[in-house]
Every structure is written in structure tokens, then in C-alpha cells.
Amino acid sequence: LLEHEEGVRRLITRPMGLRLAPHPGCHMLRPSEVLRLDRSFRPEVLDKIASWAGATVDPGPEWPACCGGGLAGIDEVLSAKLLMDSVRGPQASKVDAILTPCPFCFVQFDIKQKEGVPVLYLAELMALAMGASPERIGLRYHRTKIALPSP
């Protein structure tokens, strides 16, 4: 996706105007010496892509916290604690949603958190910015509803 920035930007028909908290997920960045997608400390890849969609990004922590999704089946208490730690920053900064490309993180943030911060998959953000309707991409199935700006 990063190699196609110009082409992706041309497809944006509805800049989103959302304020998002990027949460790349552990598996997108680590081990950084193997993946070489972004740096583990203060990653910027989601910030960059979100900006293409017309969103602004809350800088968040330098080191993204683990959401605990990978531990959910092993240690529910630790998983819940990690989730709470991950949600605290976005909740305090009152973002419109958490942005993630990770299925574990999505499930944790949408289904298991009790704080009520909405979450968007990266693909959902891009589809909306490219003109897809919320109904078409299934936003109605999200547990925590997101308030989208008017088109």
C-alpha cells in the first residue's frame, strides 16, 4: 500500500475528517528487524495512511501498548489489563475511534473493552474514504458505534 500512495490518494472521494488513535498491533511491527515496515518506537505507517483518507491522528504513546488479544485464551485477567492500558490514552484524548489493521486488536477493542471507544479497521477507513457506505462495509455490526461526519 505504501508504494502506491499517489494512486490511493486519487481514489479518495470522501475525506473522513475523523480524529483517530492509531494502534498498529504487535504483529505489524515486530520483529522490526525482519518486517522492516516501520520502526517499533513511535511507528508512523498508520498515521501516514490515515492522513491519505483525510483523518487526523492523535500522536499517542511512543511505544504502542499490546491490546492483549493474543493472550485472551490463555490469561483473561492479563488480557483485560493490557486492553485497559491500551484504551486509556485514546479515551482520555477523546478521539473518534481507534484505528487498527489487526484482527486481534479489533476484537479486543470492539467486543471486550468496556470504555466505549469505537474502533475502525484500516480497510474500513479506506473504503469509507473511497466512497463506500457504512452499510456496505458493515459498520452496523460494530458493538461500539462510531459517529461519522456527514458526507
Name each region found by the language model.
Residues 1-151:
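Iron-sulfur cluster-binding electron-transfer modules in prokaryotic oxidoreductases
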